[in-house]
Amino acid sequence: MASSAPSSSSCTFQAESSFGPAVASCRRAFDFTLYFEEVVFVLVPSCVFILLAATRLLFILRRARRFTTATAATTTSTDTSSSHSCGNAAQNQHTPIGHGLAHHHILQQCTAGLLVTLHVAGLILLCTTVPSRQRTDLSVPASVVAALAFGVVPVLAHFEHKRRRPSSGPRSSSLLVGLFLCVAVLLRAPLVRTHAALYGSGSALVAVEIASLVLQLVLIAVGEVSSWAADATSNFSPEESAGFLGRSFGSWLWGTFVTGYRTTLSLDSLVPIDSSLESRIVATSFDHILPVSPSGKPGKNGQYRLLLALFRSLGLYALAPVIPRLCLAGFTLAQPFLASATINYIGNGPAPDRDGYGLIGATFLIYTGIAVSTGWYWSLSYKNVTKIRGGLVDGVSQKMLRLSQQHGTESKVLTMMINDVYRITSTLAYAHELWVAPIETAIGTWMLCRHVGPPGLVVLGIIGVCLGASTYVGKHMAIQQGVWLAAVERRIGATKKMLASIKAIKMMGAGPSVAEALERLRRLEFAASRKFRALIVGTLLSSYSTATLAPVLVFGTYIGATTAAADFSASTLFTSLIWISLLASPLIQLLQIIPSFGAALGSLERIDAFFEKQEFTDERDEATAVDSSCSEKGEKKKEHVSLSIHNSSFSYTDDSEDSILKDVNLVINRGQHVVVTGPAGCGKSLLLQAILGEVAPQNSGSRVCVDGKVAFCSQTPWLENLSARQVVSRFSRDKDPSWTDRVVDACELREFLEAQDPDATIGSQGSALARAIQSRPDILLLDDVLSPIDYVTKKRILRQLFGKSGILHETGTTVFQVTQDHAVAQLADIVLRLDETGALRPYQFPPSQADVEDENGDVDNGAENTRPRESSHTTEAQSGPPEPKSKPTEITDRKVYATYFESIGFLNLVLFIGGGIIFAFCLKFPNVWVGWWTADSSDPDEASHNIGYWFGIYAMLNVLPLIAVAGWVAQLMMLIVPLSGSKLHRKLVDTVSKATFSFISRVDTGSLLNRFNQDLMFVDSRLPLDLFNTAAALLTGIAQVILIGVSAVYVLASIPVLAAVLFLLQHFYLRTSKQLRHLDLQSKAELHTRLSESYQGLATIRAARWQRQVHAEFQAGLDRSQAPVYLLWTVQTWLKLVLNLVVAGLALVVMGAAVGLHQHGSSSGASASASGIGIAFLNLTTLGETMTNLLTAWTSLETTLGAIARMVSFSRDTPAERDVLVRPDSLDHGGGGGGDRAEPPESWPESGGIKLEGVWATYDDDDESDENTDDSGGRPATDVAADGEKHEATTITTTSSTMTTTRYALQDISLEVRPGERVAVCGRTGSGKSTLLLALLGLVAVRRGRISIDGRDVAGVPRARLRGAVHVIPQDPFISVASGNGETIREALDPAGKLGDEEVTDVLQDCGVLDKIVGAGGLAASVSDEALSLSAGERQLFVLARLICRAGGRCRHGGGGILLLDEATSSLDVNTDGKTAEVLRKWLPNMTVLSVLHRLEAALKYDRVVVLEGGRVAHVVTPSESTVSSDIFAFFGRSRSFLESRETGGVSWLE
């Protein structure tokens, strides 16, 4: 290169050797120097790429070694959740790379190699054909570094292809390679242009460089089509196989969009998402968010421990959004410079055409850069928060499995999983705005000061005040959010109780009172959230303060501080306003985020406090660790001890001073069968909990030891939402089908399994028992699991399980069970009894109760021979046909919006819309005023008004938006939110409470609870803000487009095109986004169900050590949930990208038209004004953000409205009970009295007579449908086999268009119960006993026949009136849902206050629960479960006492009535059960009683015994008849001598 020359030679080649950056115009117009291009366009990107590529290669090699080690370890383990793979589990499979990818990789390597060859050739040509005087000092070094950089490309691509993690998908080209190639093409093109100008366009060097550019484009295209070559490996994520451009412009989402547009998406049809989001990978990264040693105290890092742990878990991925966010900040801050240059270009007269073309090019680069960098920023941010969501939800599930079962834990877990995790993730998505906002503020303020001087610093004061206010609000918001969520937890807990007890509630007619209790809790919830909502109003008000007040204060200070005439030219005013707008627009969002961060920190504190909870500790493990034997030290080991308890006392709570079980000593040898009995509330279940380790001993020196694998079956069976087949075998690792068959047969499940629909989700107690035995335990713990089963079935199960030839005896299983059943006790090796003092003593049942045949079961066999085994097609727990496979009703957007607007009221809707219009007008009209101001001030000599006039009105106009937004948001948050939330909650409660019993009993409880939890959370917290943001952005955007069109008239021509593009975009986008949001809600409902089910079965899961498998299955469900969550976020990111590209197109139209008019306007007479361009750019700078905010808020609004759509769909799809079964005027009584047509009197039923005439009942929902009948008198035809056995209670009715199959649970039942009579209803499981009670209450469909009470057909009585008139004690006792809302025990027992305190106390004393009530605090104590702590038997006694208190006054004074008992004393011992009959006779002497039971001793106390079989009446006998068939006694397993012994014993069993 030539040596130094004087400055006069700037037009020689020496000018190319300077850094420039611009070269002298005498050499080339509008170009950079060669030296600058070699440094910035070649050396810098090449060196950065080489450095990053080396780092990436090192990472790949290290990861490959780790993966090889992990794979070797994994292949030796067993996949515990293979049978439960779902959703995106396919992405976990290591599918080999197909031939298409192999060929693609070869093509890529060949192309890259050829590209390297061309760069080497170019280097040689540069050195040989270009003289040194025409090269800079960096020409050759830059070419060498560039050749090295391109030489790294095939190496990196090869290792990305060969050394990647197999589950990460087919990456034939890395993002780093794609990014480098794209940048290289953009930067090398100007250098090739410069070389062509310097060395000639026909030179060999330029030809090689052009070929190199073309080959780079080819290589980019090859990398982008890698996903097409991966069709054979469709299990991989298309995102991971996409190239850089595909990721930048979201082309990998096209498959999802097309599928969603053409068909219906499902969780199984979604494309696999990024493998880094798999739960197993996320759980590994986030494993340290759980404290290592929970102590129940806050961690050492305080409230930020969990937040820091989350970011530490993300590692370097937490910093991934930094680079695109900095790029976005740079492009955004370039807009004022572009606007200023454009205004000056328009206002300064003629200019070279190249300046206009440069402005057009700059517009393209700036706005396209904003679009692409925005897409990358949000894509990486959403990926991080998706990982955080997975880590938190997984952590909550893990922690739940480690905690003891305590009241309120379940509702707390469900609230955290939905509400808290949502708040955290939706807030942390904006985490990077916190650090970038100060940078943008500093730069923006500095640039503002360059235009207006020191007055520009005023904006910092406004920002400081607003930030201080937001920080203050954020701190208080976390506190108020905790108060609100505590109220939510109380409501969710009460709702869970309601849903779990829906059968009992409907039977008791307690629906209205329960609904009112839930409504009361809902009102308390809104009262608790009032301050939180007020803080939101303050937050939104402060967020808009910067945008409205900053221009006023800045310009006011500028006017006051300027001594000379202030410069109010269009360039100064609009450039300043653009800077203020760029400062204020992100601050509006930031100031809303800061309080949200306060709320998110509150949620993090709640979850962290949950993580810090003291975990369940198994004291048995410590004992076993000391001594592997369960024998006492020093004791001679004659037999192997399986279970032992030494000197231990137990209570349900650690802080209880009095022990329920005292000084328990127990030693059980292997293979023994031990039975424990005792009165209700004595602590039998507590003893089982102690053996399981769920309850720790209270005294020192105690020892609990369990030696062997344990299985536990609780009194309330733990049944998941699975079929009976899946329940039995889901935890079994035993692949021996013969063992499964033996277990199924022993538990009498064969016929049930064969008859059940494979897809039905109906389990049974027998399924839970079979699951426990299927796991081959060494010790089997049973908590009264056989009490609901009829005696005949029970005898078979006992013989096949516990008899000498039973499978448990064969396997040597130690059995420890709690029961009140003497039939079970007779097969036990040891019988123990717990008394009221908590002492455990040996026990022997009285002879009258132990008079049972031997295990060969003579009477049982007789019963089995005389009575064929009924088909199990109709079961006692029949809940109708399987849940419908059809999709929910499609709800249109119009219906959804109509439902929501109806909930807020017409007046509120009009006020809300009006407030939004006023706000948008007040917010944007000041821009128009500034345009008039600048136009008037352009010539000071001709100004019509002074500055004070213009500025004063401008100041007033900028204050009006604050007033408007304050009233607008206050109306929304303080009036609309509680009003709509209350109405929608009531709609949900009414839908559930009024649903038909057959429908609501088969709907998944978790799905229902999710509607009361997540859906209402959306309605309360997310929907109002989304509605506000959508309305504000929509109205503001309309105002901005109008201002752009008015200010630049030529832009109006593009408005129709813009509208068409937006319409097509939303039409195409919304079809997919709507489905994704529904799948998001659906998958969260599944997680809801999984967590709820797992919590209910914690004791069972921990007993059998199933935690790992349950957690693995939960992770599979979490993967299903992560897919729609992440895809919904990614399609929203794609929408932001496209909208910013639309804004880029609009900006190009504005700029192109302005440049064109400026260049050619003088000849045509048209021109663009500086003030018009200023207004246009002032709105263009924020239009992209406004449109992004609009579509983001709109899509979020669509998501939240999806919750309302689910409510509407649920309401439509849920069949509701008719108030009256048939119209009273259409009743055909066949001679019945006409009194049925009138409303029954308040005293009805007065006597309590019941009559059933030819009743056919079914669980089918269509109870009002007419049905064709046969020729046999209108009764449905019944299949009868040749031997006379009714194999199926089924009738098939054929019409001209359809064929329906109806399964009848009751068939031709005719029975009359006289007033005051007490009738026992007995029968095998599935015989129709409970169905008979349900038919009396109108809970099942009576298709034929008539049921009357006191001569009145119940078909004409409103159902609520019917259930309110009949007293019911259900099998599952229901006390109250409204725990914690102030209801006392006195109010729960006698809400009407009919009895005095002494009478209530007497009732409690007679029912045997007075001591428990006194211990809870007396009649004035809360009725909550945690306060009462009643056992299952005590709950039944409490319900009995409540019934007596509510009905006793009337019955004791001569009134009658009807009492239905559905296994109401199944959890009581025989003695207590006998006392309940005496209590009923004492307090309800005139009551007609119809009782479903299984015990003969109880049945013999009734006036008559009705035996049902196969839905028909088999026997109706009175115990006093000497001609009673022995069949009735055979049913109970008693011989005829039993009756004789009772009679000869001088005992009047009728008493």
UniProtKB/Swiss-Prot annotation:
Function: ABC-type transporter; part of the gene cluster that mediates the biosynthesis of the phomopsins, a group of hexapeptide mycotoxins which infects lupins and causes lupinosis disease in livestock.
Keywords from the UniProt entry: ATP-binding, Glycoprotein, Membrane, Nucleotide-binding, Repeat, Transmembrane, Transmembrane helix, Transport, Virulence
Principal location: membrane
Recorded GO MF terms: ABC-type transporter activity; ATP binding; ATP hydrolysis activity
Feature: compositional bias, Basic and acidic residues: 1219-1228
Name by which UniProt lists this protein: ABC-type transporter phomO
UniProt cross-references to PANTHER family, sorted A to Z: ABC TRANSPORTER ATNG, ATP-BINDING CASSETTE SUB-FAMILY C
Pfam families membership: ABC_membrane, ABC_tran
Gene for this chain: phomO
Binding site for ATP: 678-685, 1323-1330
Similarity section: Belongs to the ABC transporter superfamily. ABCC family. Conjugate transporter (TC 3.A.1.208) subfamily.
Region (Disordered), start-end ranges: 843-889, 1219-1296
Domain ABC transmembrane type-1: 326-599, 910-1199
Glycosylated sites: 384, 647, 721, 1179, 1486
Subcellular location(s) of the protein: Membrane
TM helices/strands, residue ranges: 34-54, 110-130, 139-159, 172-192, 202-222, 314-334, 358-378, 428-448, 452-472, 535-555, 577-597, 903-923, 959-979, 1027-1044, 1137-1157
Compositionally biased region (Acidic residues): 1259-1270
InterPro entries on file: AAA+_ATPase, ABC1_TM_dom, ABC1_TM_sf, ABC_transporter-like_ATP-bd, ABC_transporter-like_CS, ABC_transporter_C-like, ABCC_6TM_D1, ABCC_6TM_D2
Membrane topology recorded in Swiss-Prot or TrEMBL: Multi-pass membrane protein
Domain ABC transporter positions: 645-861, 1287-1535
GO cellular component annotations of the record: membrane
